[in-house]
């Protein structure tokens, strides 16, 4: 799994755990819904660290805690 896929899976997991939808995550985070849906789009390869931080802030989750999960263990190398 690449980092983009792991980030998307982690945000979807957090939304599910909190019972919120992606558009609600956007509102909580002060970003547009299109920003969140663009990040979730599998055809997009990039995810901004600034966006990740804003979404974590909206969830009141430290960014270090966001990345400290088994989903981020054993990621594929991004340089090809």
Predicted segment positions?
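Short coil turns linking two alpha-helices in DNA-binding domains
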Residues: 21, 32-33, 48, 62
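The alpha-helix within a helix-turn-helix
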Residues: 15, 26, 56
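A short, Lys/Arg-rich alpha-helix, primarily the initiator
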Residues: 1-20
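Residues within the helices of the helix-turn-helix
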Residues: 12, 23, 53
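Short, basic-rich loop-to-helix N-cap that marks the start of a DNA-contacting helix
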Residues: 43-57
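Recognition helix of helix-turn-helix/homeodomain-like DNA-binding domains
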Residues: 30-46
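Short, charged recognition helix plus adjacent turn
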Residues: 1-2, 38, 64-80
């Amino acid at each position: 799994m690449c980092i983009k896929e792991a980030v998307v899976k982690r945000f979807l997991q957090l939304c599910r755990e909190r019972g919120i939808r992606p558009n609600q995550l956007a509102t909580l985070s002060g970003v547009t819904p299109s920003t969140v849906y663009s990040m979730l789009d599998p055809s997009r390869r990039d995810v901004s660290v600034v966006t990740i931080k804003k979404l974590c802030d909206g969830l009141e989750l430290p960014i270090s805690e966001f990345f400290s999960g088994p989903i981020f263990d054993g990621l594929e190398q991004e340089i090809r």
